[in-house]
A protein has these predicted regions:
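Intrinsically disordered, low-complexity regions enriched in proline, serine, glycine
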Residues: 17-21, 48-58, 73-76, 96-99, ...
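Intrinsically disordered, low-complexity regions enriched in glycine and serine
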Residues: 25, 100-108, 146-153, 294-316
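Eukaryote-biased recognition of electropositive, low-complexity segments
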Residues: 184-323
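Eukaryotic short linear interaction motifs
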Residues: 14-18, 45, 69-74, 179-185, ...
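Core residues of folded domains in eukaryotic genome-function proteins
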Residues: 2-8, 12, 57-62, 72, ...
Length: 323
């Protein structure tokens, strides 16, 4: 299986500085950003440990910060320690000072002082800084064409050499945390570089949000908007997950994201396999799941990434081999 270049794209908007409503890691009070940082460190540590016989980490990681734009905090590296340092350097922006307008629960304006994030900027950054490898056969064909089409034995050797090289899959893992404004999402197929349809690129998202019942919160609309960015290449599948303030849900979601995109099931199928009997609407649409649990503090649904599964992260989850 090909290695992965995992681009960790972390929202540092003001909402990420809000208090985590439940107990954080270790049972202590924490902020949303600190909980996310702990979860990402665990993800990187476990992902890097899946090939213990190798002399170095099979996978590489990069860290991006998302505010009004995109900042590359750490370029791709297999040095896990430097990835941890980059994750720990992430600091959420401070919320704007309260105005005289009505204030929603949590002490923020009705829109939370948020700026809608433009996902086109993120896709442009990834296409420029972390582009997935081109099809090796197409590059060999182009060289043969430019040399007049005389391939012969050398041309055949080039094809064998190109196809034997193991090229990484590029996966963007987006941690998004804005509950009051819908992001700007490019229409399907409209991104100029065709990244979402590239067979070596995958986009996953873990959405952190406030309680759906809080004033001004539109987390259902936000989640549905993000979920339109389904990647269609390579036979793999994007995962779009969510978490309110439920640490068990977060742990299970992070475990699901460990699996290689080429190996994992469709999202609903995966969570159906690990859900508790009678847990409900794992296969529902995001909006339907929100309606089913509109006042839940834990998230948008009762079943997605929950359902009594272990909060540990084993070497395999739901029958998947983690590499």
């Amino acid at each position: 299986m090909s290695p992965e270049d995992v681009v960790l794209c972390v929202d540092i908007g003001p909402e990420m500085s809000s208090e985590w409503a439940g107990a954080g890691p270790g049972g202590t009070a924490s902020t949303r950003m600190r909980v996310v940082q702990a979860a990402l460190r665990g993800f990187v540590r476990r992902k890097a440990s899946f090939n213990p016989k190798a002399s170095r980490c099979l996978h590489r990681f990069a860290v991006l910060a998302l505010d009004d734009g995109v900042t590359v905090v750490r370029p791709l590296t297999s040095d896990v320690r430097s990835v941890f340092e980059a994750i720990d350097r992430l600091q959420p922006l401070q919320p704007p000072e309260a105005s005289s307008s009505p204030v929603a629960e949590g002490g923020e304006d009705s829109d939370g002082g948020e700026t809608p994030f433009d996902f086109s900027e993120l896709l442009d950054c990834i296409a420029e800084r972390f582009p997935p490898a081109k099809d090796p056969l197409s590059s060999v064909t182009e060289r043969n064409r430019s040399s007049g089409g005389s391939g012969g034995v050398r041309g055949a050797e080039a094809v064998v050499g190109a196809t034997s090289q193991v090229r990484p899959v590029v996966r963007a893992l987006v941690i998004y945390g804005r509950s009051f404004t819908c992001p700007v999402v490019p229409p399907t197929g409209a991104e100029k570089h065709g990244l979402l349809s590239h067979w070596r690129f995958f986009l996953d998202c873990l959405y952190f949000h406030r309680k759906p019942s809080d004033e001004g919160v539109i987390c259902g609309e936000v989640f549905d908007s993000i979920a339109t960015m389904e990647t269609s290449g390579g036979g793999g599948h994007s995962y779009f997950l969510e978490c309110g303030h439920n640490l068990q849900r977060l742990n299970v979601n992070m475990a699901a994201l460990l699996a290689h995109p080429y190996q994992r099931d469709y999202q609903d199928t995966f969570f159906d396999k690990i859900a508790a009997p009678g847990s409900g609407a794992a296969g529902a649409t995001p909006a339907a799941r929100l309606d089913n649990n509109a006042n839940a503090a834990g998230g948008l649904s009762n079943s997605t990434a929950n359902g009594g599964a272990s909060s540990g992260v084993p070497g395999s989850v739901g029958g998947l081999t983690m590499i």
